[in-house]
Each structure stands twice: as C-alpha cells, then as structure tokens.
Curated annotation (Swiss-Prot):
This is LHFPL tetraspan subfamily member 6 protein. It holds the Pfam family L_HMGIC_fpl. Keywords: Glycoprotein, Membrane, Signal, Transmembrane, Transmembrane helix. It is found in: Membrane. The gene is lhfpl6.
Length: 200
C-alpha cells in the first residue's frame, strides 16, 4: 500500500492520533474536579457531572443520585467560564481529531500529504492545542460557582480548590494538547514527501 508520508510522517500520524484521543477522552470524561458532597464522591467535567443532589419526595429530604450525566442545557453549566471552556476545548479537540484522521489516511493514500500540507496540518495542531490549553486555563475560573462550592466544603474560589482536587481527566486533556503543540507540530514539518513535478 502506497503512502504519502515519510517514516517520520508515519510516527507523526500515530502520535497525532494518540494526542487527539488523549485530549478527547479527557475532555469527555467528567473527572476534571473531584470532591464530595453529603458523604458521596462528586466529580465535574466542563459539561458533565457525576453524583448530584435530588429531592426525595418519599423521605422529604435531599439525597445524592450517584450517576453521571450532562447538564440539562448549555445554560445549565454552572459558570460562564465553564461554558466558554466547553466550546473552546471542544473546537480544539475537533481540530486535533481532523488532523489525526487526515494523517492516518495519509498512511494509506499516495499524494495526500505533501510537505506543505504537513506544515499546514502542524499549524492546525498548534492552534488546536492552544485552544485546549486555553480551555484548561479557563477552567479554574469557574471554581467559585455555587455547585462547586457545595462540593468543596464551601471553601473553593477561583484558582482555589478548597477541599477538592484536580482529577486525571484534566491532566489527560492538557497533556494531549501539550504534546500536540510541541511534538506533533514539530514532526509535521517532516511528515510529507516532496512532491514530484511532472512535465506538462
């Protein structure tokens, strides 16, 4: 099977896919922020949450429902910063996935990725990683929302976790973005083969 990638390009394609998958899994999982409420573990993502209080009509009180789910609407996300983070990080993940899938196709299709296309793809990966990094930087601005404060012993504030801690999904998302910005962007410069010039 013919390829439009150099040996470095094949490594770039695999690394691009790994970085995109890492960032996307981290973005989708609701384990960015970990805490507890009413003795139950609670976790937050940018647009998802695990364990939340509901009104128990039978007992006439509030109980914790231990399951994960999305917020009912975009406006239901606890803070404006988390809404912006969701959009920015989602776009960044989409860009990384687009380049990764194109790079994987370049392993199987001739003349798909030239040196110029490889460099453009690297630039897109840099922008995608930058967007995800911006989303990760915005996330702590939402720690002062009421939902987070209830989970973090009413002691959290912007850039202050209180009794909560950062979860693995936050690190996963950031690490995928950082690797895409540094490694993938650099390797993309050497990914495509030199185009043949055909005489007409």
């Amino acid at each position: 099977m013919a390829s439009s990638l150099t040996c470095a390009g094949v490594i770039w394609a695999l690394l691009s896919f790994l970085c995109a998958a890492t960032s996307c899994v981290g973005f989708f999982m609701p384990y960015w922020l970990l805490g507890s409420q009413m003795g139950k573990p609670v976790s937050f993502g940018t647009f998802r949450r695990c364990s939340y209080p509901i009104r128990d009509e039978a007992r006439g009180g509030t109980v914790m429902l231990e399951q994960c789910g999305r917020y009912a609407s975009f406006q239901g996300i606890p803070s404006l910063e988390w809404r912006i983070c969701t959009v920015v990080t989602g776009i960044g993940c989409g860009l990384l996935l687009l380049v990764a899938l194109t790079a994987i196709m370049g392993c199987c299709v001739t003349d798909l990725i030239s040196r110029t296309i490889g460099r453009v793809a690297g630039g897109i990966q840099f922008v995608g990683g930058l967007l995800i990094g911006s989303g990760c930087a915005l996330y702590p601005l939402g720690w002062d929302s009421e939902e987070v404060r209830q989970t973090c012993s009413n002691s959290s504030d912007q850039f202050d976790l209180g009794s909560c801690e950062i979860g693995w999904a936050y690190y996963c998302t950031g690490a995928g973005a950082a690797a895409a910005m540094v490694l993938c962007t650099w390797m993309a410069c050497f990914a495509g083969k030199k185009q043949k010039h055909y005489p007409y």
